Amino acid sequence: MYDPARDCYQAEGESADARDAAEIAGGEFLADSATPETKSDSTKSDGNDPKQETSETKRPAYNYLPKIARKETTSGSRDAASAKPQLKRREREDVRVAGDRVAPRADMGSYVDYSEKESRERQDRDRDSRDHRDRDRDRDRGRDRYDSRDRDRYDSRDRPRDYDSRDRDRDRDRDRYDDRVRDYDSRERDRYDDRARDYDRGSRDSRDYRDRHDRERERYDSGNSRETRDVRESRERSLSPTREPKPHDPAAPAPSKQKRPSQRGGREAAAARAAQYRAEMEKREARAQAAAQQGDQVGDSLVRNHYNQAPERGVVARQSSPIIKLRNFNNFIKSVLIQKQSLGFGMRVIDMGCGKGGDLNKWSRQRVRDYIGVDIADVSVQQASERYHNMQPRPRFYAEFHVADAFGTPLIDIINPRAFPVDCISSQFAMHYAFATEELARSMLTNVSNSLCRDGVFLGTIPNSDKILEGIAGGLKESEPKEGEERYGYFGNSVYKVEFNTPPTKDQAFRPPFGHKYTFYLQDAINNVPEYVVPFEVFRALASDYNLELIYKKPFLEMFDEEVKNDLNMARLAERMKVFKEDGSLGIDGDQREACGFYLAFAFRKLGA
């Protein structure tokens, strides 16, 4: 029956005092082990209760169940120290069995459990509604834990966002990287300037700097003092075509075996005539050299003025040029030459005849370390510097530009000596100006040889002398007369034209090999600028005198066909640079193809130290 004072059910005849004594003793209290007082009390019957049991059929009053029901304890004001023993005591608490319902003590919290005989409907009806709330709360708590793990696993910048946010983050990261690169460049530049100031005012290390500078000047003055013994001996054994045989001296006497005193007067007269002849020849050479220098100065001024007056065109104007296919083709050839013949990452490069800086992006893709541009046209150098500072993305290499003649002036007088030696020297569509005289050509090769390190590379593009000979042999067209100028004839087409003011050579070689002048015209690019023929075999033999070995030589058209056919990456590069024919295939056709065939590419390697 239910006891309101204890808030639980108790069996008939149960003694409360005996049960409390059992709780205090901690033992099991069963009907079999009850005291006489308890048995006598248990045999008492209540007349009002219809359910009375005899002593033979009495069920045990208490029994431990193997499974304790789910509970909700309310500790109230009890502290943590007293709550733990109380919990253990509740685990040992016996449960009153009344019928088929299990009910806990009042001080044990609210237990809810049912026997196997209870129906599912009654379980659902009597189950506490708070159980559902607990299950929902646990499910939400688990979902929160999963979300927190997901937040910890992925950074906030890696989550899908709108394109504007990603662009802003990318720009921010790029700006941070550019700031680091700019800070590094500024530190390097400041350190470079500090060393230069120490060198100028004479610091502790100035003596070593000046001695090194003097040694460099001696190397330039001596022509090529770093050549090896084997190279020098091979050069002395080989006959260079640039060295012409000396003319016959008519005043020189015939060799005679007579040694009589009567022959002394004749020998003295012959020696006097020979000295007079040599003096006349020296005067003639001096006049010719002065005329050549005057012509070179006029030619240099024309070249300088032409490139200074050429306007700087934007990307849109260049794309609308009538020779855009030729420009794309030439840029592709230069890109392939730089990519395949240069040394690779971390180079220090000198560009002789840098112009407006059209090759800055090509060298940037090679990840060079330093770029030094030298050109005779001051306006072009200024435009090249502006192009470098406006490059997007910002360049990762240091660049400096100088206005000077890279062929006739020693580079050590133009560039700081600490920049030498360099890994690569490039001269794109400019080296033919150095073949105006032999002295200028040798000065150019001296700069190249003395500036390169061991195994350094000298590469460039020049007009093909074989194509010039073919054009002359095919017959020259008559030039239109013009007042104040002498014109002999020309060959070419609507895109380019090579015109001679004097009758060109008729044989298959240019003798003498220097000073063969012609006027070159290229549509929308070059307007009748004087240039000079570069006989390539003469150039190769002359370069061997300066420890430069030829490693590559290809005309433009052959080079394009070979690279596109054998290298898939080069074919993809040609597609990106839009080198297409009219039918959409790779290449160039029409008059622009003939103009591209006018040039060739070369590369030399520096031998020795």
Curated annotation (Swiss-Prot):
Cross-referenced CDD domains: AdoMet_MTases (cd02440)
Binding residues annotated for mRNA, in chain numbering: 330-331
Region Disordered: start-end pairs: 1-299
Transmembrane segments: none
UniProt-listed Enzyme Commission number(s): 2.1.1.56
Domain mRNA cap 0 methyltransferase, first and last residues per copy: 321-607
Localisation: Nucleus
Catalytic activity: a 5'-end (5'-triphosphoguanosine)-ribonucleoside in mRNA + S-adenosyl-L-methionine = a 5'-end (N(7)-methyl 5'-triphosphoguanosine)-ribonucleoside in mRNA + S-adenosyl-L-homocysteine
Residues holding S-adenosyl-L-methionine: 334, 353, 375, 405, 428, 433
Principal location: nucleus
Biased composition (Basic and acidic residues): 38-59, 88-104, 114-249
Any one GO cellular component localisation term in the record: nucleus
Biological processes per GO annotation: 7-methylguanosine mRNA capping
This protein's record includes keyword Chloroplast: no
This protein's record includes keyword DNA-binding: no
UniProt function note: Responsible for methylating the 5'-cap structure of mRNAs.
Protein name: mRNA cap guanine-N(7) methyltransferase
Gene designation: ABD1
